[in-house]
Amino acid sequence: MGLESYEARYTLQLTEWNQRVFERRGLDVVYVPGLTLDNSQKIVVGQVLDAHGRSYFGMSQMMNLVRLMQQGEVTAEDVIYFEDMFQPGIESLPYIMDQVPAELRPRIYVRCLAQAIDPDDFVHVWGMAGWMSTYEKMVNHFVTGVLATNEEMVAHMRIAGWTAPIYNISGLAFGKEEVLERIGGSANIRPFADRPRRVGFAARFDQEKQPGFFMDLIEMYGELTTEPCEFAIYSGGALRSNNPEFVTRARAMEAAGKLKIYDNIGKNEYYDHLNNTRVLFNCALQDWVSNTVSEADTIGCNVLYPAYRSFPETFANDPNRLYIPWSIDDAYHKMQNLLREPHHNMGLISDWNNGTVDRVVDILLGLGEHWNRTGNRYRDHVAEAKYHVVKIPM
């Protein structure tokens, strides 16, 4: 049960990333289709997914799933996997399964991307948290398992009182090979020394991503050094925000020559920009792993993110590419270091996230119980690095 495709979002590539792994693993997969309101692949109402488009696609997709269930095509031997926990029309599943024989009740897994358990999610900005948290409790009553992207998200789910089994997949679905294909292969990764001194920002320009912190960093850089550096904003659509003051400030800074805005860019063009960037910077309050880190790490960029929520796990507790939240001084000094040379562990983050879909498959097949965070010892795994990194003695 995949998400509808948006040009400016990762859903355009998500099916491809999943499909490659499903085929390699030899799975018998049915991709349940949905209907779209139009062919624009654009977000018109809302920030993350289009409000009308998500509802229309999700409900039409559920209609097709219900038809398959009614025809006996879905049985207890099957798994229904929802790419997003928020699926309009999903309440039809317990309504049906509570009334059919046990042999017609499939296992159901949902992947959570944020929602009401995250105090910085957009559902709180728009006042949706009350009904969304109720929706989440409903889903917990009938699913086989919920997939979290990291240990900190697991903790948020547990303190919210979620009752379904929770699994940490430790990453977002990502296809490193597909991303490299878009730049013509790894041979086309531009050498770090040949790249301009450029720091990029690729998060949405909404308040939960703290774009003001990035602009403060730009101002600080201009005050402390005369060494040239381009600061760039990358946006799939026109630059916009749930706080228009950020856009106004960014446009004024661009007019003053302090930064460059690259908006309305397609994914391939974005990858070309990353291939000419030395550091991708992030300062988000709300970012559970983030595909931006995997893409930049794949294409030869250094990445500098806050040591906050999911990122210590994503970075395997790397002290050089994680800065103290929210210390602009620490961010500045580490940015300066990362502008000089490529980090010795470049590529390992994207390698790890490239295995996320395999971890999902293992869980769906009953082979991933070591990722199960049910029970009272779910915090035992927080400090452990999920993959090995190269250590350089001081």
Tell what function each PLM region has.
Residues M1-S92:
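N-terminal pre-catalytic "stem/leader" segment of glycosyltransferase-like enzymes
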Residues V125-V146:
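Membrane-proximal helix-turn-helix segments that form the acceptor-binding/catalytic region
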Residues H141-I189, D194:
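Donor nucleotide-sugar binding/catalytic pocket of nucleotide-sugar-dependent glycosyltransferases
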Residues A187-M220, F231-A232:
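Conserved donor-binding/catalytic core segment of Leloir-type glycosyltransferases
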Residues C229-V247, D263:
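Glycosyltransferase donor-sugar binding loop
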Residues P244-N268:
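Nucleotide-activated donor-binding/catalytic signature segment of Leloir-type glycosyltransferases, i.e.
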Residues A284-Q286:
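Aromatic "clamp/platform" in nucleotide-sugar-dependent glycosyltransferases that forms part
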Residues W326, H333, N337-V390:
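A charged, aromatic-enriched C-terminal amphipathic alpha-helix characteristic of glycosyltransferases
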